[in-house]
């Protein structure tokens, strides 16, 4: 199923920006699935278990209570200023047949507390087309691979993957690419883009993940 749509003339085309590569993918909400696991799993595991043909890394956290990803979900809900959120109402689990649709809340504010899954990240990059203030520190000034989730309408989400970009440079860049809302996800060595059963962007040593976004 071809779910990738052209956003602008550069959509799904590698673009050189200071020797970096970047990709923008538009995905209809109805075609998006979130997969959560018990603990950390390799990309190959997701591919084999769920017949994944497209995926990207997702959240810093999931709603599990395991190892380094023990969170946080309940704590974050009580302290909503700690992280920006995307609230996702349904998701796919490895041991159930849950509904696979998601709802993208484009205000990126406090999530629906009835949500079954919440994807978190930091910082918030754009909100309603407005560039958000980003503190200048080692994290935001470092040029690293990054993954961003966002949107420009209510019918689709946008995924942005860059091989090297500073977070402080994201607001202007993402506005140029047509984003209205955007949030930085886990990135750096976790940045991954797998499309049409091909690793489009990956690290030399693949990491394992608590959850992925697939379509």
Q: What are these model-derived regions, one by one?
A:
Residues 1-3:
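Positively charged n-region of N-terminal signal peptides that target proteins for export
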Residues 8-215:
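Gly/Ser/Thr/Pro-rich low-complexity, intrinsically disordered segments
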């Amino acid at each position: 199923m071809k779910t990738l749509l052209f956003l602008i003339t550069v959509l799904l085309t590698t673009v050189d920006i200071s020797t970096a590569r970047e990709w923008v993918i538009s995905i209809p909400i109805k075609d998006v699935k979130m997969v959560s696991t018990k603990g950390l799993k390799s990309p190959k595991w997701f591919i084999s278990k769920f017949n994944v043909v497209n995926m990207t890394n997702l959240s810093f956290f999931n709603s599990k209570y395991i190892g380094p990803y023990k969170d946080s979900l309940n704590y974050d809900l009580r302290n909503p200023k700690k992280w920006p959120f995307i609230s996702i109402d349904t998701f796919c689990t490895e041991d159930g047949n849950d509904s696979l649709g998601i709802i993208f809340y484009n205000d990126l504010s406090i999530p629906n507390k009835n949500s079954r899954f919440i994807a978190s990240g930091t910082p918030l990059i754009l909100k309603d087309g407005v560039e958000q203030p980003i503190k200048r520190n080692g994290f935001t000034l470092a040029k690293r691979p990054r993954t961003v989730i966002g949107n420009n309408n209510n019918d689709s989400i946008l995924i942005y993957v860059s091989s090297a970009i500073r977070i402080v440079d994201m607001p202007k860049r993402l506005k140029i690419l047509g984003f209205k809302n955007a949030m930085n996800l886990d990135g750096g060595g976790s940045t991954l883009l797998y499309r049409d059963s091909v690793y489009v962007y990956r690290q030399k040593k693949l990491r394992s993940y608590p959850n992925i976004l697939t379509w």
